[in-house]
Amino acid sequence: VEMRDNPALRDIPLAIGGSRVQRGVISTANYPARKFGVRSAMPTATALKLCPHLTLLPGRFDAYKEASNHIREIFSRYTSRIEPLSLDEAYLDVSDSEHCHGSATLIAQEIRQTIERELRLTASAGVAPVKFLAKIASDMNKPNGQFVIAPHQVAEFVRALPLAKIPGVGKVSAAKLENMGLRTCGDVQNSDLAMLLKRFGKFGRILWERSHGIDEREIHNDRQRKSVGVERTLAEDIHEWPECEAIIENLYPELERRLAKVKPDLLIARQGIKLKFNDFQLTTQEHVWPRLNKEDLIATAHKAWDERRGGRGVRLVGLHVTLLDPQLERQLLLGI
């Protein structure tokens, strides 16, 4: 959106995020910036070391939201089965669509062309029979391209697929799997499911299924929000508990406001806190609590501060709540 509205930004390294003065975090970066190693969720200071000539913009959320809504409206012309993942990403199930003679490949191509024509924005797409492969395919021909994994190609594609490419397999998990001699989905196909279950539990079964091209998750139009949170990256590290308590006091009204938007009765399943230390290690602590409560959050944070800080400075403080499962909430209300 920024490059569309200002063509001078198109070919230079650009990122949306915190300023050079205050410590912030990169929200997103364009492809010229990514060539220097700049990534989302990266501290701004790190990004500037990698790319000193990086152009930083504070971001215009309203403009991004407007573009996102327009794109969702384009999606809806082809199917009602849409599962948004973020402002700029969504799953679409077009298996019952009559557009383009029912061809998912042609539908994806037409959607991309429509986005470019109506919004002057580029889009990438992945087409596959199951969700996780569509996600992987969407990253194959970025930017402004698409990649198709037809049903008859799944077995061959998956066999050679590195496990690190599977959504949910992070660097730590990939390293553990590598140490076990498991680098590709083909390696997992030749391994024992019982061993994976013993070593990784539920994740072991998911890994086994994905390695066989199995993903039975359906598109969920009405994805239920599971949590609400608010956090602050600090301009300078803090080392004294009263400073942390003051930040929580300032953050709490915003958490209360955000929660009230989705749960006016403020009923929750759990609430907790997050602290990020100056070595970038993160700790969270939460427990079951029926209703948003500031005093309990402060007590929880104080406990984490005393037991887990170890003299380190704190660079981020966050508060969050986990929402009640709607079905469980109905049961509780019926019980009352």
Question: Which residues are covered by each model-predicted region?
Answer:
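DNA-contacting surface of Y-family translesion DNA polymerases
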Residues: 165, 173-316, 324-329
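Gly/Gly-Pro- and Ser/Thr-rich, intrinsically disordered tail segments characteristic of DNA damage-repair
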Residues: 1-199, 205, 321, 325-336
